[in-house]
Amino acid sequence: MSEEKKQKLTGINFRDVSTCESTIQMLQKVADDGFETAFTRAADMKPCPIGADSACCKHCFMGPCRLNPKDPYTKTGVCGATIDTVAARNFARMVASGGAAHTDHGMSMLDMFREVVKGNIKGYKITDEVKLRNVATSIGIAVADRTTEEIAMDLYNELERTYTQVEGEIPFAKRVPPKTLETWRKAGIVPRGAMREIMELMHRSHMGVDQDYENIVKQCSRTALADGWGGSMVATEISDIIFGTPTPKVAGVNMGFLKEDHVNIIVHGHEPLLF
């Protein structure tokens, strides 16, 4: 390891990035051993000052266009976008990408749920029938005198609209507190369907489509709600129904829980289908 690289890796005070003593010790050991982490790479990265203020646009091939955050309204991008529009477009693309990630995760969980209900997947089962009935009831599905399989299939068909519906309101909008839902309706941000909202946000943030930053940000709100009250909520509820609703447990945590004389298996992530 060169002296320059060693200085970059070991010249960081890891107490500035964590309050956890064991994490600080491990970060220091990794650096001393000559390996990079996100923290050392971040310290070595000098952010672009224009990009840091979201004043750079590269959504089309007439650019990239750089605007001056210190003198923001003296010029526009080639397409005529102001700095407000550029910032809104940049933020919109991040909202769309994050929403798509949660939406796809939720769809995977829902696809698995359908196959479990149909009996095509034998390794999983409906573990929490009470949660199944509560979720079904919350969105208007009848549960009295019906089998678990009947309720589950109706729940699948209803929740599928979270993703595929192109008009109306997503199913879990029925769970939103009435005053909050009224506010959303007045603002025009109740999600129709996750795919529709993400697609429209990508469309609006494209060059030559929507130059009004307020319109773009409004669609950001609708897409974010499609994520939180759609894709993410579906994933959470289906996970609980299949794997069981979490309950408080006493567990060991942190680096100090690893045992030197054991084979330690570390599970990372939130995709329960893999486990």
Predicted stretch roles:
Residues 2-275:
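Metallocofactor- and cofactor-centric catalytic cores in central/energy metabolism, strongly enriched
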